[in-house]
Amino acid sequence: RCIGIHFFNPAPLMPLVEIIPAVQTDEQTLNGAVELIKNWKKTVVTCKDTPGFIVNRVARPFYGEALRIYEEGIADFATIDWALSELGGFKMGPFTLMDYIGNDVNYAVTESVFKAFYYDSRFKPSFTQKRYAEAGFLGRKSGRGYYNYTEPNSNKEANKDRVLGTYILDRVRCMLINEAIDAVFMNVGSPTDIDLAMTKGVNYPKGLLAWVDELGHKEILDQLQHLFDYYGEDRYRPNPLLRRMVANKTKFFPH
């Protein structure tokens, strides 16, 4: 009768609940948990007992790739946030969101997922975020994070160059999509539940799997392959399921 039930903060307001059956969970316990949470008017997704479940696993590149782009000197915090929010439709840019969550909390989640996946480079934490957390730049709660909340006029303005912005959006989005596809590939959850989790759990503008259907699987494969060829790092390796879907010309939601 053991089962995991994961709420999102703040629990009274956030609609999503992830239900995680353990190895020893029986069908009656699972069905009872699903019915209970639905009676509370929550949106339920069921997922495998793996690190990060659905949301905290699939969302890692939203923070990690944004930090990597900053560390490479491609764009500053404000420009990356502008690209993801204004061009991508995300409710908050990654640096605004990390400041809202708290750099200490967000870093700890990334580090725990990284360790739980046996140091898979896809989830590698950022030294930038580690140093900010160590310096006490925790975000809104400390008055200073990637942005200065006590002296907001000191923050840089975004460089609203659409070519640069499109590059940033494409790079972060293809990494998110690759992670969502990996969750399907590894049977973490169904395509429907994974998209539901990302739209209801972290307010993404679209489900990532519906998004790749819309953009084209070949387009996303090409973006990932370019990054993989350029950097030679496993974090950019396209998922085998994506390659198979391109070869077979299939979609997650054909209708």
Predicted regions and their residues:
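Positions in alpha-helical segments
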Residues: 15-18, 64-65, 178-179
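NAD(P)-dependent Rossmann-like dehydrogenase/reductase catalytic/cofactor-binding core
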Residues: 38-49, 53, 67, 71-255
